[in-house]
Amino acid sequence: MSRRRRVIHKEEKQDSRYGSALVARLIGTIMHSGKRSIAERVTYAAIEESRQSSDAVDPLETLNKAIDNIRPRLETKSRRVGGATYQVPMEVAPERGTALAVRWIVNFAKARKGSFRKALANELKDAAMGQGNAVKKRDDTHKMAQANRAFAHFRF
């Protein structure tokens, strides 16, 4: 991790159906052992299913709303100061917040029973309404940061 200069980020790839970088990131997170076509099929079906159950016209509207509801604003990072380790609250960069939100959605969808497609659709639906396990995880992350704000002066 170089401290010399800012990293120049590559342009994000977009998915073939919606032309969205967020959907491409979701597909990449779901993909296992390089099987992109299976991940795409599951993701597109889940997005369509979550859109049909809500009153949204645009299929990406539900996904974007779900990601915005899950994206954390604060998190805690461990910082060692003189033999003691403190959980120091830090602001989350937008890119990291999106990555965490996508990861949480996929992990909590995997934890649900039934087919992954239905579980992902239900998790997206719940997240768009401000409910579900991923939203609870975001709230827990914020509570942890709030509880440890006394250590905010250790921020680096």
Locations of regions flagged by a protein language model:
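Strongly charged
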Residues: M1-S33, S37, Y44-F156
